[in-house]
Amino acid sequence: MFVRLWNATLRIQASPAAEAIFVRHDTPIVVALWHNRLFIIGDLGRRYRPDWPLHALISASKDGAWAVAFFELLGLNAVRGSSSNFGREAIYALTDVLRRGDDIGLTPDGPRGPRYAVKPGATLVARRARAPILVFGAAFEAAWKLRGWDAFRLPKPFSRVRLHGRYIEADDLESGEAGAEQLREALLALNPDVEIDPTRLECVV
């Protein structure tokens, strides 16, 4: 509840083009975002995709229990599996979620980094399920940067957050390391690493 109240103070903005991207309803999608943008992901689902439950991968170990509670606060459903090495079990579990018609959210640089280094898990799942990847971006007017490997962004109450997005269709997604680099470049383009006037960054369609 506290997280939702915090989010309610934020001035979330998105261009009409970005909103049209977010509300796409012809297929379940893979939402890809940097680990340090996780705080804002629940707002995407509540505002634009309320009929598409969003699932995220969490470690099956005992250490994953705290993450389940945190993800529930963000409005995410937990899929238990090996999030460290993105093993076969995790790929199958996430593919099943997409095939039954729900969305999944993945942080390609999580759960332990390095920051902004893309692992191939997101592209593997998207290619296997023939699902488009929504490259999700958030630009902050003012945010605290927490200590940690990802420099987690915590937007300050009553500040503006500008949401951005673009799709990489399944047919356009490269395989292996090329696909990982393709996704990394798209994420970097939509997520400025400095605090800016969020309205200056336009949606990339």
Write out the residue ranges for each language-model feature.
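A transmembrane-helix-recognition feature enriched in membrane-embedded lipid enzymes
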Residues: 1-15, 40, 44, 69
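Catalytic core of membrane glycerolipid acyltransferases/transacylases, capturing the structured
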Residues: 27-85, 145
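Non-catalytic C-terminal accessory region of glycerolipid acyltransferases
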Residues: 1-8, 48, 73, 77, ...
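Short linear elements at protein peripheries
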Residues: 13-30, 34
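Conserved beta-strand termini and adjacent loop/short-helix elements that scaffold enzyme active sites
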Residues: 15-17, 59, 81-84, 166, ...
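Short amphipathic alpha-helical segments and helix-helix/interface helices
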Residues: 19-23, 68, 122-126
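Residues that cap or initiate secondary-structure elements
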Residues: 18-20, 37, 62, 112, ...
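A generic local structural motif
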Residues: 15-19, 43, 91-93, 150
